[in-house]
Amino acid sequence: VVTIVCLDLGYTLKCNKLVPLFYKTCPAGKNLCYKMYMVATPKVPVKRGCIDVCPKSSLLVKYVCCNTDRCN
């Protein structure tokens, strides 16, 4: 008798891509979702995805990071 056991050893985070209808599963080590947009147009995201460290925002670009599935 052969028994195969599959264990999920880690939580996998899912982050939205630029179009929120689509998402991707983040690779190991990238445990944040982010959304980047221009300060002048805050309702129009420029980029979304997975990241390891949330970048600092600037006068022109704002980053919003979170750590739950599809929160970006």
Curated annotation (Swiss-Prot):
Tissue occurrence: Expressed by the venom gland.
MF GO annotations: toxin activity
Assigned protein family: Belongs to the three-finger toxin family. Short-chain subfamily. Type IA cytotoxin sub-subfamily.
Species of origin: Naja naja
PROSITE patterns: SNAKE_TOXIN
Domain of life the protein comes from: Eukaryota
Record's protein name: Cytotoxin 9
Leader sequence segment: 1-12
Primary localisation category: secreted
Pfam families membership: Toxin_cobra-type (PF21947)
Localisation per UniProt entry: Secreted
UniProt xrefs under CDD domains: TFP_snake_toxin
Self-association state and partner proteins as the record states: Monomer in solution; Homodimer and oligomer in the presence of negatively charged lipids forming a pore with a size ranging between 20 and 30 Angstroms.
Biological process per Gene Ontology, one example term: killing of cells of another organism
Keywords: Cardiotoxin, Cytolysis, Disulfide bond, Secreted, Signal, Toxin
Cysteine disulfide partners in this protein: 15-33, 26-50, 54-65, 66-71
GO cellular component assignments: extracellular region
Function: Shows cytolytic activity on many different cells by forming a pore in lipid membranes. In vivo, increases heart rate or kills the animal by cardiac arrest. In addition, it binds to heparin with high affinity, interacts with Kv channel-interacting protein 1 (KCNIP1) in a calcium-independent manner, and binds to integrin alpha-V/beta-3 (ITGAV/ITGB3) with moderate affinity. Preferentially binds acidic phospholipids like phosphatidylserine, phosphatidic acid and phosphatidyl glycerol.
Family annotation (InterPro entries): Cytotoxin_Cobra, Snake_3FTx, Snake_toxin-like_sf, Snake_toxin_con_site, Toxin_cobra-type
